Amino acid sequence: MKKKLVSLALAAAMGMTLLAGCGGSTGSTGSEAAGTSSTAESAAASTAESAAASVAEGSSDLASAKVGVCIYQFADNFMTLFRQELESYLVAQGFDKGNITIVDGANDQATQSGQIDNFIADNVDVLIINLVNSSSAATVTDKVVEAGIPLVYINREPDADEQQRWTDNDWNVCYVGCDARQSGTFQGEIIADLGLDAVDFNKNGKIDYIMIEGDPENVDAAYRTEFSVKALTDAGLEVNCLDDQVGMWDQVKGAELVANSLSQHGTDIEVVFCNNDAMALGALQSIQSAGRKVGEDIYLVGVDALTEVVQYVIDGSITGTVFNNHFAQADGAADAAINYLTGAGNEHNIQCDYTKVTADNAQEILDSLS
């Protein structure tokens, strides 16, 4: 019940170029992200309402529908939560669990492409795909559309040009996810809200930070990197990037990179930004091994609100994170699939909001995840 309350309470808004964390801006703005909110909220609400009506009216025999789900990598903490919720929600809506097939792309696009080919050969009724590489979207879209199968992309957003093709051709293709610009903005705001005096341990008048990025081909990584720093500068704070490395969303890699940065830059590092919580957990290990203490001589923020990380926020071991609402996203993806199967159709971009997680609301978020 709690997770459903989270889905209902937080479902709302969302939206490419790669930037290094020490680099400049694409020209996108925070207000640009915020400006999509009302449209996205309307699309999300419409999708859910249409799906609920279809289920209530029994307009389609969902139990006999075959659903193919491609996840980029089962080892990803967040996508584990996502796929578990997706399967649970699909079954709750009337799908037969035996007709839901979820496969692991093992973070290899060639592997995932073969899995998509297999689903097409198996004549699945709808495909839900978490791409290994967002740049492969056009190729994937073409083969799935040619096969006459509705397609729901999740988590990794295809670029604007690709999404425009869906609109121009009126294809049964959509994306369900959150606006990563918002997650980056929230990360930066968590630090900015502390104030310069609290963060500027070396008293040089700047926020000295390191950035641990996710996948260089992933738009979420690009936006989180850019907008976390932009939130600081928008708050009037001067920033200094000491290091920017790619951790590929991995906890072990995150620990290694942060350990190296701490060895090189020592106490000059005041903030560690991580594009996801897995890497933040790795960063925490290295911070503690270096004899540093979050909240006393360094700050650490992530994204996803994994249960372990939220508990660390409560304990004060991690400064904050951003709740990447897997309930709303997974349920929204399932609702979109239902709408395609029942002929209701969807908007091409269906979005939901992130939630900033600090010591002030971490217990509430943790309770909702239980």
Tell me the role of every PLM-derived stretch.
Residues 17-21:
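C-terminal motif of bacterial Sec signal peptides marking the signal peptidase cleavage site
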Residues 2, 22-370:
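A residue-level marker of the well-folded mature domains of exported/periplasmic proteins
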Residues 1-12:
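Positively charged n-region of N-terminal signal peptides that target proteins for export
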